[in-house]
């Protein structure tokens, strides 16, 4: 059935979109094929129940009719048997094959040739069966081929004489060959056509699963329902468009309750954006300008380091410190949000139902929840529909709905499956509207982070103090770096430097360098991977120091510690603690002194690492060990870690790191494997990028969030304001390692953190031990200096390079090349 024929039957089809018209044509063709198969089935039933005793045009009787189709079936079957005999079977069989070809979308061209071959095949079939004797069981006076068959057999007898057995056999073979040839032509089963149809058959059958092919009858009913629902959805859309055109001619008013534009998935054209440039272009160009400017700028001169405790930083100016104003941030524009009528949502829902029916998924869209970037359609599946089957159709749903991508997931706690489709008009999420939202203003979070908006447009505010650490992954351009910027701005907009300090590690030297010089920093932005290891080791020591102070006051976390300090300060008491300062040279006994504890509250410390992969390449074991200890123990001490990487592979996000970071954020990734690495399940590869993320809370619950955007200019304005509030009080010990101290964690941190020229005093001690004891082995140096094996091995390699010891022999022993009385350096 051609498209023009359908348009003549249904005038409304000409007004439908091309995708709907094409789908409707396919459904009508399938319905026609189903009708032909049903017609051939009825004809076969009439022929199978034919009886010569039934009433017909050539026989009158009062006996009841035994034909299954009644009087009409008896007359039709009798005519077919009288004229064609058993050759009528070929008449019905060819029609059934035509119906099968139409249902499976195989081509049916050259209709005149098909019909002519069909008639000729039926006549030849009647002659073929008339070649064989019927005996006495045949109730008709004619042969097995009826009147037509007898005429075809007896016609050559005029030339060759009365037909004998040999004549009938030869004629039967010839007629059989002719019947087979005409049958293949009538059915379109020729060799050339078969080869041409293979590709089309594969394309048509590809979206269907194996279990669906066995249920084409029930699926055909779904196709009919789809056609009806699509037509209904189009009518609703046309009525809505006419209504909007009338409303737009009058005074423009904003509809209450609608704040964002949704896609017209029914096939109509989406309204063009008001601004000449789309949000996606603004997002990409502003982010590229940020990277270009930071690459061209020379490293700014860093402020001189001052050795001061972190709790004393910005203490003098804390009372006068002024938090940044939200006025420097961009506000939402009036044209960014476009309402969507309920009629359009209803039309999209019905179109989605039709697509699901195409793939054999029965159910109903019970709710459409529009959001700033995507719309969530909740499908209530029919009994017996597996959720895994619907989830596996995500790519097919996106293709059928003409969407960039589609994400399908089960709605927790409900008998519903969520289908997330992107909006035609993407709304930009602004950081300003999140900072002034009621959820942010009224929050009691210690370290509030503005993550973005949910699918429904609600703000998402989390407390990093309760998280307590975060792992972020995403490819280039997915919005990972912008999300880190918005997290930093969320902290500096709410907390003063005496409440929260920051340690920023940026091996790429691009993303976080703009924050260099703000009062919240404990140290200048760390760009050297080796110094990053030292900074993480300092964080471990700071954590242990805080735990000792908490144990002295009998508290369990940093909030209790600060509260106890305020109570002691109000009472005028000065707490002390016992500190081991050394040993008596004469007696060898340990010396302890009483040290007063400061009454200044301890600030939170947030460690931000922008690119984890670069650090793992330089010092993987050091980083993994330090991050593990911080993630396991630092929560109560007020230290929190945010790790980000653009390469979420197993060699970067190791099992140890993953186990200690229950809170994770996945932006768009390139493959399902990367999504499983960061989240443990698929879905991140179907995100839209540019701030679209999947947020996994500590309990394993995953929700989709659309992150806010902060431009380069906004970040620079906030940084300039912070710099006017005071100079940063840097702590030199953060990046300056003290190698003379014995490290309990020596087995955790290897020698890569001290560098080629670091640890000079420790090296001198190792040389003195070798010259004095005349023993040179890694394990001996490790035991004497109480350090880790990696560091001891590094010291031995350096002594070999400087000619103090020789290379190890086959037994692992080294020759000492310096005399005992010699002094090195």
From Swiss-Prot:
Membrane-crossing residue ranges in chain numbering: 32-52, 79-99, 118-138, 146-166, 170-190
Biased composition (Acidic residues): 279-298
Region (Disordered): 254-318
Positions bound to ATP: 477-482
CC terms in the record's Gene Ontology section: plasma membrane
Keyword annotations of the record: ATP-binding, Cell cycle, Cell division, Cell inner membrane, Cell membrane, Chromosome partition, DNA-binding, Membrane, Nucleotide-binding, Transmembrane, Transmembrane helix
Gene Ontology terms for molecular function: ATP binding; ATP hydrolysis activity; DNA binding; DNA translocase activity
One Pfam family in the UniProt entry: FtsK_alpha
Entry's localization field: Cell inner membrane
CDD domains in UniProt: TrwB_TraG_TraD_VirD4
Ranges where the FtsK domain occurs: 457-676
Matches recorded under PROSITE patterns: FTSK
Membrane topology summary: Multi-pass membrane protein
Cytoplasmic topological segments: 191-825
Main location: membrane
GO biological process annotation, one example: cell division
Subunit structure: Homohexamer. Forms a ring that surrounds DNA.
Family: Belongs to the FtsK/SpoIIIE/SftA family.
Role of this protein: Essential cell division protein that coordinates cell division and chromosome segregation. The N-terminus is involved in assembly of the cell-division machinery. The C-terminus functions as a DNA motor that moves dsDNA in an ATP-dependent manner towards the dif recombination site, which is located within the replication terminus region. Translocation stops specifically at Xer-dif sites, where FtsK interacts with the Xer recombinase, allowing activation of chromosome unlinking by recombination. FtsK orienting polar sequences (KOPS) guide the direction of DNA translocation.
Domain text: Consists of an N-terminal domain, which is sufficient for the localization to the septal ring and is required for cell division, followed by a linker domain, and a C-terminal domain, which forms the translocation motor involved in chromosome segregation. The C-terminal domain can be further subdivided into alpha, beta and gamma subdomains. The alpha and beta subdomains multimerise to produce a hexameric ring, contain the nucleotide binding motif and form the DNA pump.
Protein name: DNA translocase FtsK
Source species of the chain: Bradyrhizobium diazoefficiens (strain JCM 10833 / BCRC 13528 / IAM 13628 / NBRC 14792 / USDA 110)
Phylogenetic placement of the source organism: Bacteria, Pseudomonadati, Pseudomonadota, Alphaproteobacteria, Hyphomicrobiales
């Amino acid at each position: 059935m051609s498209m023009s024929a359908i348009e003549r039957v249904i005038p409304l089809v000409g007004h439908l979109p091309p995708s709907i018209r094409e789908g409707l044509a396919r459904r009508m063709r399938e319905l026609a094929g189903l009708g032909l198969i049903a017609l051939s089935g009825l004809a076969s039933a009439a022929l199978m129940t034919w009886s010569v005793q039934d009433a017909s045009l050539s026989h009158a009787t009062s006996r009841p009719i035994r034909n299954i189709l009644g009087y009409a079936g008896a007359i039709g079957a009798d005519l077919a048997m009288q004229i064609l005999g058993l050759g009528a079977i070929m008449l019905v069989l060819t029609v059934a094959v035509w119906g099968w070809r139409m249902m499976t979308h195989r081509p049916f061209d050259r209709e005149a040739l098909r019909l002519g071959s069909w008639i000729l095949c039926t006549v030849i079939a009647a002659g073929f069966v008339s070649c064989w004797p019927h005996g006495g069981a045949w109730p008709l006076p004619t042969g097995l081929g009826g009147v037509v068959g007898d005429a075809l057999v007896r016609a050559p007898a005029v030339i060759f004489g009365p037909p004998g057995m040999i004549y009938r056999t030869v004629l039967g073979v010839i007629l059989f060959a002719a019947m087979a040839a005409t049958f293949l032509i009538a059915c379109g089963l020729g060799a050339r056509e078969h080869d041409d149809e293979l590709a089309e058959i594969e394309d048509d059958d590809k979206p269907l699963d194996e279990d669906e092919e066995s249920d084409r009858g029930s699926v055909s009913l779904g196709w009919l329902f789809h056609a009806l629902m699509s037509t209904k959805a189009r009518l609703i859309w046309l009525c809505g468009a006419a209504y909007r055109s009338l409303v737009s001619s009058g005074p423009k008013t904003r509809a209450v309750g609608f704040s964002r534009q949704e896609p017209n998935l029914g096939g109509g054209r989406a309204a063009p954006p008001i601004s000449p440039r789309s949000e996606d272009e603004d997002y990409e160009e502003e982010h590229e300008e940020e990277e270009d400017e930071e690459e061209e700028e020379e490293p700014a001169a860093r402020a001189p380091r001052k050795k001061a405790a972190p709790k004393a930083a910005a203490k003098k100016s804390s009372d006068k410190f002024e938090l940044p104003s939200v006025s420097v941030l961009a506000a939402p524009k009036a044209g960014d949000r476009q309402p969507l009528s309920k009629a359009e949502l209803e039309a999209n829902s019905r179109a989605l139902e039709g697509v699901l029916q195409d793939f054999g998924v029965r159910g109903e869209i019970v709710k459409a929840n529009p959001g700033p970037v995507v719309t969530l359609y909740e499908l209530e599946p029919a009994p017996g529909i597996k959720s895994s089957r619907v989830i596996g159709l995500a790519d097919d749903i996106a293709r059928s709905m003409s969407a960039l991508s589609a994400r399908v997931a089960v709605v927790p706690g409900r008998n519903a499956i969520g289908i997330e489709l992107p909006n035609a008009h993407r709304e930009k999420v602004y950081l300003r509207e999140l900072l002034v939202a009621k959820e942010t203003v009224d929050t009691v979070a210690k370290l509030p982070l503005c993550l973005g908006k949910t699918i429904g447009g609600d703000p998402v505010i989390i407390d990093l103090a309760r998280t307590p650490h975060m792992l972020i992954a995403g490819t280039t351009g997915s919005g990972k770096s912008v999300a880190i910027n918005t997290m930093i701005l969320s902290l500096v907009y709410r907390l003063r430097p005496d409440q929260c300090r920051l340690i920023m590690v940026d091996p790429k030297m691009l993303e976080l360098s703009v924050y260099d010089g703000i009062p919240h920093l404990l140290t200048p932005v760390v760009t050297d991977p080796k110094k990053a290891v030292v900074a993480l080791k300092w964080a471990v020591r700071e954590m242990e120091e805080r735990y000792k102070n908490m144990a002295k006051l009998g508290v369990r976390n940093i909030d209790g510690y600060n509260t106890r300090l305020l109570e002691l300060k109000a009472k005028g008491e000065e707490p002390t603690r016992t500190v081991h300062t050394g040993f008596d040279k004469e007696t060898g006994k340990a010396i302890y002194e009483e040290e007063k504890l400061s009454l200044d509250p301890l600030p939170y410390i947030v460690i931000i690492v922008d690119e984890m992969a670069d650090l793992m390449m330089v010092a993987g074991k050091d980083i993994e060990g330090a991050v593990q200890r911080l993630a396991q123990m630092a929560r109560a001490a007020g230290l929190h870690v945010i790790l980000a990487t653009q390469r979420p592979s197993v060699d970067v996000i190791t099992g140890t790191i993953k186990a200690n970071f229950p809170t994770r954020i996945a932006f768009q990734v390139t493959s399902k494997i990367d999504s499983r690495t960061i989240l443990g399940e698929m879905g991140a590869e179907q995100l839209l990028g540019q701030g679209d993320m999947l947020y996994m809370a500590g309990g394993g619950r995953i929700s989709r969030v659309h992150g806010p955007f902060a431009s380069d200019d906004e970040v620079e304005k906030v940084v300039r304001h912070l710099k006017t509030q005071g100079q940063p009080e840097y702590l030199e010990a953060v990046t300056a390692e003290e190698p003379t101290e014995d490290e309990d964690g020596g087995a955790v941190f290897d020698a890569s953190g001290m560098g080629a020229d670091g640890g000079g005093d420790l090296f001198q001690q190792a040389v003195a031990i070798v010259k004095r004891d005349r023993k040179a082995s890694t394990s001996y140096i490790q035991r004497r200096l109480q350090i880790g094996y990696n560091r001891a091995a590094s010291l031995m390699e350096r002594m070999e390079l400087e000619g103090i010891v020789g290379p190890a022999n086959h037994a692992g022993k080294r020759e000492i090349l310096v005399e005992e009385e010699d002094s090195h350096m």
